[in-house]
From Swiss-Prot:
InterPro entries: Aromatic_Lyase (IPR001106), Fumarase/histidase_N (IPR024083), L-Aspartase-like (IPR008948), Phe/His_NH3-lyase_AS (IPR022313), Phe_NH3-lyase (IPR005922), Phe_NH3-lyase_shielding_dom_sf (IPR023144). This is Phenylalanine ammonia-lyase. It catalyses: L-phenylalanine = (E)-cinnamate + NH4(+). (E)-cinnamate binds at residues 255, 343, 349, 379, 451, 479, 482. It comes from the Eukaryota. GO terms for cellular component: cytoplasm. SUPFAM superfamilies: L-aspartase-like. GO terms for molecular function: phenylalanine ammonia-lyase activity. The gene is PAL. Its main location: cytoplasm.
Length: 667
């Protein structure tokens, strides 16, 4: 305040410390992405959003957008903003009364701005009329209606922008929109019809239409009921009747990027969470695939310098540190180093290098959109301090279009590594002993596991890769070539929302498959232990000594027999462990044959012949082993396994528990 008059701009118009805002932008990207996401989730859950014009976050926008589903979040306006809003509104009225020529106040709009009028109120009314050009389908949530969650996001962002006091609108109108939000009254906006260049003109005009009581305006109430303007005002508790727009107020309501940036905020909240989830899923993938944790070594990533990669590797390293699966895998590698390749395939080994840049892109886009939702982006801007209206182009939504295109490309890349990992997981040629399609049932002919899921994943990923194509290179000149370049911000945000939905489908399918793999590793471990014990018992009974207690040369076979069990994949024989065409019985027999061939002269003696004991050994095993294997399956189904699930001692356990216990996601 100067001499009792509100001043809404600094004397020189620039911040001396950081005039180009690069310092603030760079500072916003310091610190950890993980910490940012945790903060975002915390903000999303807060019950109140306090608006002052400059501190709104994407997570708060996402929280308000989701609040319409029953989790109410209240919006409060800063009383300190009232004076600035009033000052700009008063300036417009005084300017009009003095006969000052101002765009959108005394002139037409866009390509017809050469026209003049002194009837400012009627001009605003006509603005809303001609912008109400959207097309709706049947119903209030049809394929041609903007999702109500996105409308709520747009309302919040527009209030925040107008609170800064550069737009020439009454504070009472902002209070009315706030009441709509707090009482879950949502105007119906068209899904299409904006190019986000002179702002999101067409969809925002329907909010203005509701405020002014246009007959075609509709809203949806808390229970999904359709409301006309009168009912919407009544349920929201907005008193004083419909608003008669003063000069500039219609333009202030529609000439902003709130619909595009609101939806972008919703998208980026989910994109950040999904990016973090992809890092965690990659670590769990390493666990169930018996991967080598060396790929997360900090020196490797420090030498690459990229912060997203370094953090992705650190998160994976943290999850794998001390993992029981990693310890078990290390024993497998030591026991038979030739059983699998020296290095894991790229989908695992280079996952930090792949995911890191995508996270950097998403993080940068988040900061860009947060700047946008705290920006004043209409035209003209009312600078009370210099007693002038500034004609510019802050309504151009290029930050939205560019950030959404980039985010969509990053989302597609995350989807690509997700399906690559999933494809390895369900393929028994690559997955280090897990059954084909993660089936694991008693009868492989009647259990196809995730075969349908793999087909669905291919469909999801194909659509996702198509959506990765940019929107912003499809600009068409509009409005008699006045809007000859335009951002297509909302269109890009809508496509990115589709991409996020598809990545959620992929991540959900993949997560359930990982949980299935964890359970199969548990079954595998118990089954292998039982098979080893059974083979050991039969070997001691049949191969160790004769009827008179004499020791047989065949007693030395047991160690090699158990080594076969250790090395053989359980699910290669689990459905019928004694079937002679399966590798287990073939290799056990080969051990006995090899020992017999090395038995020398004693092999000629029927009492010490190993060949003579092969049939007895196999018959004894066939009598016992299938029953023992079946008992393991029964214990698995009843949750009474003798060896506990390794996942419970791992840092990835909370995610497994969430799916299997909280959601009940059994397969």
């Amino acid at each position: 305040m100067e001499n009792g008059t509100h001043v809404n701009g600094s004397a020189n118009g620039f911040c001396i410390k950081d005039p180009l805002n690069w310092g603030v932008a760079a500072e916003a990207l310091t610190g950890s992405h993980l910490d940012e996401v945790k903060k975002m989730v915390g903000e999303f859950r807060k019950p109140v959003v306090k608006l002052g014009g400059e501190t709104l976050t994407v997570s708060q926008v996402a929280g308000i957008s989701a609040a319409g589903d029953g989790n109410m979040v209240k919006v409060e306006l800063s009383e300190a903003a009232r004076a600035g809003v009033k000052a700009s509104s008063d300036w417009v009225m005084e300017s009009m009364n003095k006969g000052t020529d101002s765009y959108g106040v005394t002139t037409g709009f866009g390509a017809t701005s050469h026209r003049r009028t002194k009837n400012g109120g009627a001009l605003q009314k006509e603005l809303i009329r001609f912008l109400n050009a959207g097309i709706f389908g049947n119903g209030t949530e049809s394929s041609h209606t903007l999702p109500h969650s996105a409308t709520r996001a747009a309302m919040l962002v527009r209030i925040n922008t107008l609170l800064q006091g550069y737009s020439g609108i009454r504070f009472e109108i902002l209070e009315a929109i706030t009441k709509f939000l707090n009482n879950n009254i949502t105007p119906c906006l068209p899904l299409r019809g904006t190019i986000t260049a002179s702002g999101d003109l067409v969809p925002l005009s329907y909010i203005a239409g509701l405020l002014t009581g246009r007959p075609n305006s509709k809203a949806v109430g808390p229970a999904g009921e359709v409301l006309n303007a009168e009912s919407a005002f009544a349920q929201a508790g907005v008193e004083g009747g419909f608003f008669e727009l003063q000069p500039k107020e219609g333009l202030a309501l529609v000439n902003g990027t709130a619909v595009g940036s609101g939806m972008a905020s919703m998208v980026l909240f989910e994109a950040n969470v999904l990016a973090l989830l992809s890092e965690v899923l990659s670590a769990i993938f390493a666990e169930v695939m018996q991967g080598k944790p060396e790929f997360t070594d900090h020196l490797t990533h420090k030498l690459k310098h990229h912060p997203g990669q370094i953090e992705a590797a650190a998160i994976m390293e943290y999850i794998l540190d001390g993992s029981d699966y990693v310890k078990a895998a290390q024993k497998v590698h030591e026991m038979d180093p030739l059983q699998k390749p020296k290095q894991d395939r790229y989908a695992l080994r280079t996952s930090p290098q792949w995911l890191g840049p995508q996270i950097e892109v998403i993080r940068s886009a988040t900061k860009m959109i947060e700047r946008e939702i705290n920006s004043v982006n209409d035209n003209p801007l009312i600078d009370v301090s210099r007693n002038k209206a500034l004609h510019g182009g802050n309504f151009q939504g290029t930050p939205i279009g560019v950030s959404m295109d980039n985010t969509r490309l990053a989302i597609a890349a995350i989807g690509k590594v997700t399906i690559a990992q999933f494809s390895e997981l369900v393929n028994d040629f690559y997955n280090n002993g897990l059954p084909s399609h993660l089936s694991g049932g008693r009868n492989p002919s009647l259990d196809s596991g995730f075969k349908g899921g793999e087909i669905a994943m291919a469909s999801y990923c194909s659509e996702l890769q198509f959506l990765a194509n940019p929107v912003t290179n499809h600009v068409q000149s509009a409005e008699q070539h006045n809007q000859d370049v335009n951002s297509l911000g909302l269109i890009s945000a809508r496509k990115t929302a589709e991409a996020v939905d598809i990545l959620k489908l992929m991540s959900s399918t993949y997560l359930v498959a990982l949980c299935q793999s964890i359970d199969l590793r548990h079954l595998e471990e118990n089954m292998k232990s039982t098979v080893k014990n059974t083979v050991s018992q039969v070997a001691k009974k049949v191969l160790t000594m004769g009827v008179n207690g004499e020791l047989h040369p065949s007693r030395f076979c047991e160690k090699d027999l158990l080594r076969v069990v250790d090395r053989e994949y359980v699910f290669a024989y689990a459905d019928d462990p004694c079937l002679t065409t399966y590798p287990l019985m073939q290799k056990l027999r080969q051990v006995l044959v090899d020992h017999a061939l090395n038995n020398g002269e004693t092999e000629k003696n029927a009492n010490t012949s190993i060949f003579q004991k092969i049939a007895t050994f196999e018959d004894e095993l066939k009598a016992i082993l299938p029953k023992e294997v079946e008992s393991v399956r029964v214990a698995f189904e009843n949750g009474t396994m003798s060896i506990p699930n390794r996942i419970k001692a791992c840092r990835s356990y909370p995610l497994y528990r969430f799916v299997r216990e909280e959601l009940g996601g059994a397969t």
